[in-house]
From Swiss-Prot:
UniProt-annotated stretches for the region Disordered: 564-586, 630-674, 742-776, 800-895
Annotated GO MF terms: ATP binding; magnesium ion binding; protein serine kinase activity; protein serine/threonine kinase activity
The name this protein goes by in its record: Serine/threonine-protein kinase SIK2
CDD domains per UniProt: STKc_SIK, UBA_SIK2
Organism: Pongo abelii
Function, in words: Serine/threonine-protein kinase that plays a role in many biological processes such as fatty acid oxidation, autophagy, immune response or glucose metabolism. Phosphorylates 'Ser-794' of IRS1 in insulin-stimulated adipocytes, potentially modulating the efficiency of insulin signal transduction. Inhibits CREB activity by phosphorylating and repressing TORCs, the CREB-specific coactivators. Phosphorylates EP300 and thus inhibits its histone acetyltransferase activity. In turn, regulates the DNA-binding ability of several transcription factors such as PPARA or MLXIPL.
Posttranslational modification: Phosphorylated at Thr-175 by STK11/LKB1 in complex with STE20-related adapter-alpha (STRADA) pseudo kinase and CAB39. Phosphorylated at Thr-484 in response to insulin in adipocytes. Acetylation at Lys-53 inhibits kinase activity. Deacetylated by HDAC6.
Biased composition (Pro residues): 821-833
Enzyme Commission number: 2.7.11.1
Cystine connections: none
Regulation of its activity: Activated by phosphorylation on Thr-175.
Length: 925
């Protein structure tokens, strides 16, 4: 049986599973599919997870049954409720609660981060649900934004207990599973762990995601992500309060024993700022022992009895926890009653156990059945009717299974495969009237959002295509159901003939600087409606002022921080308001002014898949070895790999112009490295990522291939290092030259001589000495340069003497110094006797006798840059300065010293980095 191609108002979906009409597909997986169903009796929407047991092995089948066992034990307002379990020979049907507003992942991707007040309310709900699970010795092990759903009142519902397990206090678990960005470090290391501590870490990541709109630990590959998690360092944005930062840091502790417990989290200062009101229990929670008849909701039992459902069988089903049709109808009716009562203020609610049975309520229920009025138990303050847009609803392929499951496909479509009891009546569709409430509080808790891929557990690899969703929307425009795609607020836009209502938001918070995105629940379905000209014409025609055009068409509230930007840039930043640019925290030591802190927006990331045996990457690390991991290499080779295409000037230019770049240009920032280092790495990260994409084994620690340019840089760097270790002859030559040039003796200066000499007490020390080895920038070249002998600004140089020779004019330099290859070590100079006259020196210029009363040397405050050739000019980063007058008035008897292969001296240090425009070095004065 397949779905008919006729209009939906002629045939309401012929596909049925038990009492449920299948209305659409929420998600698909390899062995399961999640369908949107509606109960024929209660008219309640449910999510039906249909599992093909024939495609599962024993291990996965056991995991499915354990998930069912766990969900049967859980009954919490912030956990997805299990209504019914139906099983045939080859199929398993899990009927669960349906969260209309989808994943909080999608909400954050569309609306950006939450303010701390809203994040605190959400986190209290998550904390209460996890505490409830831990109290029943159940650990979730896969808490993430994709598994946190939002109901019609924007309350949290935890879903997907497929990775859940039971634990005992003091006993460790040994199975490693979870989602990598949310997994604790002990899971990556393959250690045994305690279940509650694992959930505490995941909740810390979730809280960070709620407040920041980005992941604290992220990486392009699993090994990089693993390394960042094991380091445990993450970035704290400027807008995060100190109390929130303290709480997150105490939860994301590498040592599991030092993490906060749930009781400590509840008592934390940040959590106590706003404590939620404890709502009374609408119906009693099932205890471990069998409940008595009086503990069930008598009002629901009477309503079921009026529908012709045997009350005794219902009670037996509830006591036996059979989760059959009787229990499902009971649970669904209880949920409708809860939805009805939740519309009233908390102070006016009473516990069901404290109330006497109301005859007026019973008469109201009876009138609802006799007169035929709908029993409207939905919240009257609902500001939005959920859209009935069902993606893939009219396609036959929406019910497709794997090729081997074709027989099972027809099995779950036949109603006869599931036994259903006979029911005399049913409730009518709970469609409340459209309410235009001007006094509603503009809070996300009153808002709803229609999502294309809403659902319980989206197991498909890809999301729904917006183009397909638009086709589905166009195909359902003629249906009889009302589609409300936006908030029902002050101004309505009615599409004639279609029965659909669009709304224009007239909230002043769109223009308020203090707005924290309270109005940020605009439907994602309208993203593809922007291309519909008829919709735009209708909306523009119904608007009294053009001021409302921009917020509605752009579908994003105005970011107050981006008021000064142009409309194009404002649209980019409003999509995810975590693109903060100013205001630094003292605890965030790695932030640099002018660099945007986050670029890994949730809207740019794919959903995180849960992974079994997450510690396999640890085994690969042990097999391959740490040398294959580029992140484990020392800092110098890492920068050699990543920094060869980014000069230092370009970094400064990028920092100056970063505020004018669009959001997509900035690199993703590592929480563990300085921004300059990260920027240098990002320049070569793109080609390495392309190579990783071509080779799938790059995912596991394999080093990306180096280019020839990178290998040449490393080779040249190694040659330079060897050359610097063997330049004693060059230092000796400079030492001899400085001794001969002591033409401006200063009696007040007594500077040390080179270590090789032991001068007599009467000998005057030369005013120049080299106290540190030559700069690594020195490298022989094939050209000559002019060298000025005035070096009075370098008064701390210490040079070594050359071997004595009898020639007054020597050859310029030994030939081995003119070669690129490292020279052999020179012979040591002969020792000098104390008191002996200094040997004749080798100079390439004539010596001269100086007058006895020489004027003192002029003071040179700043070093001057000597004229060099083009190749060496790039090596010099000292500032240019004009030659001082004292140099211009020097005696003309000095010939300029022409040294081959000799660049200028610099009192500088070399940063251990590679720069192609500076011949492989980045110099700092």
């Amino acid at each position: 049986m397949v779905m008919a191609d006729g209009p939906r108002h002629l045939q309401r979906g012929p596909v049925r599973v038990g009492f449920y009409d299948i209305e659409g597909t929420l998600g698909k997986g390899n062995f399961a599919v999640v369908k949107l169903g509606r109960h024929r009796i209660t008219k309640t929407e449910v999510a039906i997870k249909i599992i093909d047991k024939s495609q599962l092995d024993a291990v996965n089948l056991e995991k499915i049954y354990r998930e069912v066992q766990i969900m049967k034990m859980l009954d919490h307002p912030h956990i997805i409720k299990l209504y019914q379990v139906m099983e045939t020979k080859s199929m398993l049907y899990l009927v669960t609660e349906y969260a209309k507003n989808g994943e909080i992942f999608d909400y954050l991707a569309n609306h950006g981060r939450l303010n701390e007040s809203e994040a605190r309310r959400k986190f209290w709900q998550i904390l209460s649900a996890v505490d409830y699970c831990h109290g029943r010795k159940i650990v979730h092990r896969d808490l993430k934004a994709e598994n946190l759903l939002l109901d019609n009142n924007m309350n949290i519902k935890i879903a997907d207990f497929s990775f859940g397990n039971f634990f005992k206090s003091g006993e460790l678990l040994a199975t490693w599973r979870g989602s990598p960005p949310y997994a604790a470090p002990e899971v990556f290391e393959g250690q045994q762990y305690e279940g509650p501590q694992l959930d505490i870490w995941s909740m810390g990541v979730v809280l960070y995601v709620l407040v920041c709109g980005a992941l604290p630990f992220d990486g392009p590959t699993l090994p990089i992500l693993r390394q960042r998690v094991l380091e445990g360092r993450f970035r704290i944005p400027y807008f995060m309060s100190e109390d929130c930062e303290h709480l997150i840091r105490r939860m994301l502790v590498l040592d599991p024993s030092k993490r906060l417990t749930i009781a400590q989290i509840k008592e934390h200062k940040w959590m106590l700022i706003e404590v939620p009101v404890q709502r009374p229990v609408l119906y009693p929670q099932e205890q471990e022992n069998e409940p008595s008849i009086g503990e069930f909701n008598e009002q629901v039992l009477r309503l079921m009895h009026s529908l012709g459902i045997d009350q005794q069988k219902t009670i037996e089903s509830l006591q036996n926890k059979s989760y059959n049709h009787f229990a499902a109808i009971y649970f669904l009716l209880v949920e409708r009653l809860k939805s009805h009562r939740s519309s009233f203020p908390v102070e006016q609610r009473l516990d069901g156990r404290q109330r006497r049975p109301s005859a007026i309520a019973e008469q109201t229920v009876a009138k609802a059945q006799t007169v035929g009025l709908p029993v409207t138990m939905h919240s009257p303050n609902m500001r939005l009717l959920r859209s009935a847009l069902l993606p893939q609803a009219s396609n036959v392929e929406a019910f497709s299974f794997p090729a081997s499951g074709c027989q099972a496909e027809t099995a779950f479509m036949e109603e006869e495969c599931v036994d259903t009891p006979k029911v005399n009546g049913c409730l009518l569709d709970p469609v409340p009237p459209v309410l235009v409430r001007k006094g509603c509080q503009s809070l996300p808790s009153n808002m709803m959002e229609t999502s294309i891929d809403e659902g319980l557990e989206t197991e498909g690899e890809a999301e729904e295509d917006p183009a397909h969703a638009f086709e589905a929307f166009q195909s359902t425009r003629s249906g009889q159901r009302r589609h409300t795609l936006s908030e029902v607020t002050n101004q309505l836009v009615v599409m004639p003939g279609a029965g659909k209502i669009f709304s224009m938001n007239d909230s002043p918070s769109l223009d308020s600087v203090d707005s924290e995105y309270d109005m940020g629940s605009v439907q994602r379905d309208l993203n593809f409606l922007e291309d519909n000209p008829s919709l735009k014409d209708i909306m523009l025609a119904n608007q009294p002022s053009p001021r409302k055009t921009s917020p509605f068409i752009s579908l994003r509230p105005t970011n107050p921080a981006m008021q000064a930007l142009s409309s194009q840039k404002r649209e980019v930043h409003n999509r995810s308001p975590v693109s903060f640019r100013e205001g630094r925290r003292a605890s965030d030591t790695s932030l640099t002014q002018g660099i945007v802190a986050f670029r890994q927006h949730l809207q740019n990331l794919a959903r995180t898949k849960g992974i079994l045996e997450l510690n396999k990457v640890q085994l690969l690390y042990e097999q391959i070895g740490p040398e294959a991991d580029p992140n484990l290499a020392p800092a110098a080779p890492q920068l050699q790999d990543h920094a060869s295409s980014c000069p230092q000037e370009e970094v400064s230019q990028q920092q100056e112009s970063v505020s004018t770049l669009p959001a997509s240009v900035h690199p993703q920032l590592s929480p563990r490295q300085s921004l300059e280092t990260q920027y240098l790495q990002h320049r070569l990260q793109k080609p390495s990522l392309l190579s990783k994409a071509q080779n799938t084994c790059q995912l596991y620690c394999k080093e990306p291939p180096r280019s020839l340019e990178q290998q040449l840089q490393e080779h040249r760097l190694q040659q330079k290092r060897l050359f610097l270790q063997k330049q004693s002859q060059l230092q000796a030559y400079f030492n001899q030259m400085q001794i001969a040039e002591s033409s401006y003796p200063q009696p007040s200066q007594q500077l040390p001589l080179p270590r090789q000499e032991t001068p007599p007490p009467s000998q005057q020390a030369p005013p120049f000495s080299l106290t540190q080895p030559l700069s690594p920038v020195l490298e022989p070249s094939s050209e000559q340069m002019q060298y000025s002998p005035f070096l009075s600004q370098y008064q701390e140089m210490q040079l070594q003497p050359l071997p004595s020779t009898s020639s007054p004019r020597a050859a310029p330099l030994p030939t081995q110094l003119q070669q690129q290859q490292p020279p052999p070590p020179p012979p040591p100079p002969p020792p000098r006797q104390p008191g002996a006259a200094p040997a004749p020196l080798q100079f390439s210029y004539q010596t001269c006798e100086l007058p006895s009363a020489a004027p003192p040397a002029p003071d040179y405050p700043t070093p001057c840059q000597y004229p060099v050739d083009g190749a060496q000019q790039s090596d010099l980063t000292g500032p240019d300065c004009p030659r001082s007058p004292g140099l211009q008035e020097a005696p003309s008897s000095y010939d300029p010293l022409a040294l081959s292969e000799l660049p200028g001296l610099f009192d500088c240090e070399m940063l251990d980095a590679v720069d192609p425009q500076h011949n492989g070095y980045v110099l700092a004065n």
